[in-house]
Amino acid sequence: MGNEVRVRYAPSPTGHLHIGNARTALFNYLFARSQGGKFIIRIEDTDQKRNVEGGEESQLRHLQWLGIDWDESIDKDGGYGPYRQSERNDIYKKYYDELLEKDLAYKCYCTAEELEEEREAQIARSEMPRYSGKCSHLSKEEEDKLIAEGREPSIRFRVPKGEIIKFDDMVKGEISFETDGIGDFVIVKKDGTPTYNFAVAVDDHLMKMTHILRGEDHISNTPKQIMIFNAFGWDVPLFGHMTLIVNENRKKLSKRDESIIQFIEQYKNLGYLPEALFNFIALLGWSPVGEEELFTKEQFIDIFDVNRLSKSPALFDMHKLKWVNNQYVKALDLDQVVALTLPHLQKAGKVSEQLSDEKNTWVRKLIALYHEQLSYGAEIVELTELFFKEQIEYNQEAKEVLAEEQVPEVMASFAGQLERLESFTPDEIKAAIKAVQKETGHKGKKLFMPIRVAVTGQTHGPELPQSIELLGKETVLNRIKQI
């Protein structure tokens, strides 16, 4: 094995880029870049029934959107291709034929029904279900008879008996498996397709992978892959298994869990920033030295240390993601925030596709008003709802504010001040509120809260004079009259 670090992300094109797969890609990418090595993307598409049209293209496009680039893949030949497993069948055949020739593998003619019966009988005896080895030493006559019955064989790897497979996991430390607990496993299906564990081991060797960094759900695959490496006398790469991502209930993140958005494309469509999502995902199961949590991609590459991958499950905290994204949104200039948010206002039918100069100025002021508190692009629709409503509804907290005894006096004074304004600007509105204070003697919350609630329906919000300006004199006076 050479000195250059070579790692891979190996997706199956079975759908869009999931947050968990994005994390696997991102950590492999950071590890390769931090070590001056190569990051390879290999498409594991042997299970044609599960492949989704457009799945491959979607995954690669959204990795690029996140800021993850690669050195070798289907679009960048580094001399170790093909990079799609479905195009490597001749390569796999050469290696499983070699195992058959050396009697390190054998043909198995058991039917699915026979295997299921065997499994059920083992469970009934409280035994660990595994293949009994029924076909492991067939005579030529027995094999000919099974072939004459029209049976199609699979190929099984002959698991060595009485051995212990040990590896030093980069995340979890030493892990060991007894081979006696692993039955002879299928490496080629009856239709001639290599299984996952066989194809992966062959590819990782031929593509000169030095480190395999993946989710802990692959731990049980590792001894099988190591046995295949050993059978050929190949160097075994270093393995590291990252902990699961869990939701707020500490349950494994499941694609069926609809309370959490789980696909990168959905975050992109909602107006999350790729740099922020990269930052957030990089902290899912990895931590830097110190308290800082916001880093550029280049900074992550400089500080990434595989030894700081967490041994505990990574909590997917939606509030944290919104906070991280908000920090990045706050760093944008107004033109960038408008580009991020305006399409969402247009899609929601709040503003038209073609804006007059006057309307464009109004929209830019509206977006600027919420710039600091915006968590993601699409949130602008919800935040600005009060500017597009004819009628506003008051919740219980708002009703309690409006029921205070000073409110009629404050509202009457404020309406009078607004009607006298010739110029409806934030400065003039601020002066009008001060005049109400002088006229009524009410100040602080007794003054500002009723005005805010009356015109916005909310007890909290952005700068009040700017909000009143954008609502417009007519709307504000109508709302005051309605209470």
From Swiss-Prot:
Binding-site list for Zn(2+): 108, 110, 135, 137
Ligase in keyword set: yes
Cofactor: Zn(2+)
Reactions catalysed: tRNA(Glu) + L-glutamate + ATP = L-glutamyl-tRNA(Glu) + AMP + diphosphate
Enzyme Commission number(s): 6.1.1.17
Oligomeric and partner information: Monomer.
Known role: Catalyzes the attachment of glutamate to tRNA(Glu) in a two-step reaction: glutamate is first activated by ATP to form Glu-AMP and then transferred to the acceptor end of tRNA(Glu).
Protein name in UniProt: Glutamate--tRNA ligase
Organism (species): Bacillus pumilus (strain SAFR-032)
